[in-house]
């Protein structure tokens, strides 16, 4: 089964599905190469994986994809630097697929210095205390500028001990945020000549019914 993602040339194909467990092996095709799933994705919070040379990352670890963090990249080195370099791939020299998370977890972790509401999240930088606002639309614009192959939708990450009522309310807001992310994603174009895809995030805390 091959699924072509809306608004993108990227596609996902099932290579194998286990009939007993529904476990799947898949193949994601991007403009920067293919990703065999399930996959170990090294985390490069600021665009690079710490303690690992780029050559080792590609030739020894054989990383097919790495993750960058939208919140941290937005604050440092900043969007102007990344855009001037021609996107995150040019900035860090990694020519294989990349994914950026939405910054939702980082905003959640700033519980003492952020305000969360329907419009989005207002928070203060952990670096200098400056005030910033992340909305679904703003996050889409930021991820377009960063330029990863896979962009994650903006979501609220609830604490693991959240009560059911709050988890449900949060999940429903995450769904509304996803609708706004999709609208903004479809209103904008990639900046660097290759396709990007928008992936949603499943929320619901520890409650299977959600």
Where are these regions (language model features)?
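Single conserved hydrophobic/aromatic residue that forms the stacking wall/gate
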Residues: 1-12
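Active-site entrance/lid segments in N-terminal catalytic domains of soluble metabolic enzymes
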Residues: 13-18, 22-210
């Amino acid at each position: 089964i091959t699924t072509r993602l809306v608004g993108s040339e990227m596609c996902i194909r099932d290579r194998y599905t286990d009939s007993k467990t529904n476990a799947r092996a898949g193949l994601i095709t991007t403009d920067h190469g293919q990703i065999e799933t399930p996959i170990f994705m090294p985390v490069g919070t600021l665009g690079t994986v710490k303690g690992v040379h780029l050559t080792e990352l590609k030739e020894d670890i054989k990383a097919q994809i790495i993750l960058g963090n939208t919140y941290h990249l937005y604050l440092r080195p900043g969007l102007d630097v990344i855009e001037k370099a021609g996107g995150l791939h040019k900035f860090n020299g990694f020519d294989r697929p990349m994914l950026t998370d939405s910054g939702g977890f980082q905003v959640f972790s700033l519980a003492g210095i952020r305000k969360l509401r329907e419009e989005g999240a207002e928070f203060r930088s952990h670096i200098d205390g400056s005030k910033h606002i992340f909305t679904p639309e703003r996050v889409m614009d930021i991820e377009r500028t960063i330029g990863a192959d896979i962009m994650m939708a903006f979501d609220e990450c609830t604490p693991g001990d959240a009560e059911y009522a709050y988890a449900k309310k949060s999940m429903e807001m995450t769904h509304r945020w996803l609708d706004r992310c999709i609208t903004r994603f479809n209103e904008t174009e990639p900046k660097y000549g290759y396709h990007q895809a928008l992936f949603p995030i499943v929320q619901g805390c520890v409650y299977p019914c959600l």
